[in-house]
């Protein structure tokens, strides 16, 4: 079980060591949607670890769609009174009567094959999911509503070629391409949350993660970096299906979740914040080569299939400027090589 792995526990400890106003979250109730995912599952583990080791007394509500998968992932918490598992599709209105202090909306299709094969479901989860969560927030007025957006909302954009994309940069997205189902619906969801905030007085923020990786990544994730990690863990050669020259801002999951906490507890109402490690802006190929070197395997090349190609991101530059986030006091702690070593070791 991942929560018993000492390296993973060290990652949880590192988040707890952040100089945050923990009194704001201790004793609170927190709803996390998409709780099975790479980012949200680590967030759940952080809160439960705080309860166990620091008497956080946080009531955690993990909303997931897949009952079997979620019960397996969180089986060590199922008998814990501070943990509540909610099985529901976010496309349906929440039939709950709980006043959450914090709502973290992280439910979304999050990998290319899903975008290509299920563009409608991708859009529904983002847009209807956001509406349903925001309607719930309108009723109960939480301390903060945090929406997990994406670097892809910047579209094709050359604004940040030198120093990274800032929160006000906005590039072109081809709305007639089905691959745009993901970034367009993330954009719409960001506009929804600021609209609800303005019209109904809800305190909202959003985070725009770069390319997040870590031991909580799932085997069925078809994103290139996820597949590189899977191959490395299995001791197999890493297969690249493009030249891999696109630049990406990578960030280890513990740094991602600590950043979310900074934004949730200290972020400006209505604000959006990039999350990226400024020392981990590398090409996809460099990411693959680093993982291969750690695992002692090779990088090989193979032609992609048609469905795979249709799911590829159209973004060339995916480097983010996280200066706004850093102004809150956050800094990334884990470099790329160390993050990949931890990921491969823990998995």
Outline where the language-model segments fall.
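NAD(P)H-binding glycine-rich loop region in Rossmannoid oxidoreductase-like domains
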Residues: 87-125
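Conserved beta-loop-beta element that borders a ligand/cofactor-binding pocket
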Residues: 150, 190-215, 226
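Active-site segment of SDR-like NAD(P)-dependent oxidoreductases
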Residues: 109-113, 151-158, 179, 210-216
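Conserved Rossmann-fold NAD(P)-dependent oxidoreductase catalytic core, especially the SDR/UDP-sugar
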Residues: 131-180
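Active-site helix of classical SDR
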Residues: 181, 185
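C-terminal substrate-binding subdomain of Rossmann-fold SDR/epimerase-dehydratase oxidoreductases
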Residues: 1-7, 84, 232-347
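N-terminal Rossmann/SDR dinucleotide-binding element
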Residues: 1-102
């Amino acid at each position: 079980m991942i929560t018993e792995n000492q390296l993973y526990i060290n990652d949880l400890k590192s988040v707890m060591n952040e100089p945050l106003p923990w009194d704001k979250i201790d004793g609170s109730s927190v709803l996390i949607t998409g709780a099975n995912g790479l980012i949200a599952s680590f967030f759940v583990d952080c809160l439960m670890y705080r309860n166990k080791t620091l008497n956080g007394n946080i009531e955690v509500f993990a909303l997931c769609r897949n009952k079997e998968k979620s019960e397996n992932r969180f089986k060590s918490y199922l008998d814990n009174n501070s943990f509540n598992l909610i099985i529901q599709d976010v496309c349906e209105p929440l039939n709950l009567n709980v006043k959450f202090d914090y709502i973290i909306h992280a439910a979304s299709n999050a990998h290319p094959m899903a975008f290509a094969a299920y563009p409608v479901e991708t859009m529904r989860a983002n847009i209807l999911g956001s509406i349903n969560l925001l309607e719930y927030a309108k009723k109960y007025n939480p301390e903060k509503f945090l929406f997990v957006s994406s670097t892809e909302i910047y579209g094709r954009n050359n604004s940040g070629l030198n120093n990274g994309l800032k929160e006000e940069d906005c590039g072109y997205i081809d709305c007639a391409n089905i691959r745009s189902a993901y970034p367009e619906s993330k954009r719409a969801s960001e506009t929804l949350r600021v609209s609800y905030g303005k019209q109904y007085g809800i305190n909202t923020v959003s985070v725009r993660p770069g390319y997040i990786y870590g031991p909580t990544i799932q085997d069925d994730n078809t994103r290139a970096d996820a597949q590189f990690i899977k191959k490395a863990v299995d001791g197999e050669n890493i297969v690249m299906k493009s030249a891999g020259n696109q630049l990406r801002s990578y960030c280890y999951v513990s740094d991602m979740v600590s950043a979310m906490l900074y934004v949730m507890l200290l972020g400006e109402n209505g604000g959006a914040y990039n999350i990226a490690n400024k020392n981990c802006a590398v090409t996809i190929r460099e990411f693959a080569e680093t993982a291969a070197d750690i695992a002692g395997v090779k990088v090989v090349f193979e032609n992609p299939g048609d469905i795979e190609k249709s799911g590829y991101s159209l973004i060339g530059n995916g480097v983010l400027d996280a200066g706004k986030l850093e102004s809150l006091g956050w800094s990334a702690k884990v470099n790329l090589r160390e993050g990949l070593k931890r990921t491969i070791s823990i998995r």
